[in-house]
């Protein structure tokens, strides 16, 4: 899925981040949205969300493990998600991503870069787990922070958080991000190939 993920981002730099599984019905029909992060749901809504996503070939839906309710945050929980048909996961917990990678799921390591120490820790984490992609929070971090990651990896680097306008998105991309995750509906409708 790593190559498919990069190809999907090449079609549009916006990754829709939906807070409720019900929002998938709104975002999946948008033709240029090819990647969706499900940030909030529970075990009851997830199975239906995965089935709905299956109606949209070429769309990639990943669930944020840390924000899912009713799923064990352990190997058994991740095995269950794979059994449901989930293709990928997002987490701040590198150990969970390690399990997910071992099961063949696409993995995105979310990193909060609040200071230089967080950058150093983030660099150590990606060496441990080698995720398929990185999501840096907030997307408005300075260019040098993104460049620190570019020096040591060729992973897809996304940014998320603190994006409200098209100008915010374009500024984040100009700083070196390959794409951005956006929970604001107005940003889902931006087509930025």
PLM region spans:
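Catalytic beta/alpha-barrel core
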Residues: 15-19, 34-43, 62-68, 84-95, ...
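Conserved N-terminal beta1-alpha1 strand-loop-helix module at the mouth
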Residues: 1-62, 69-71, 82-85
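Glycine-enriched alpha-helix->loop->beta-strand junction motifs that scaffold or abut catalytic
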Residues: 30-36, 58, 83-87, 102-108, ...
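Ligand-binding grooves and catalytic loops that recognize ribose/phosphate and carbohydrate rings
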Residues: 47-60, 66-84, 126-133, 169-186
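Glycine-rich phosphate-binding active-site loops on the catalytic face of alpha/beta enzymes
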Residues: 36-40, 95-96, 138-141, 161-193
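Alpha-helix-loop-beta-strand connector modules within alpha/beta enzyme cores
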Residues: 47-67, 75-76, 83-84, 99-110, ...
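Catalytic cores of alpha/beta
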Residues: 24-29, 73-81, 121-126, 144-159, ...
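Generic structural signal for helix capping and beta-alpha/helix-loop junctions
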Residues: 45, 70-71, 98, 117, ...
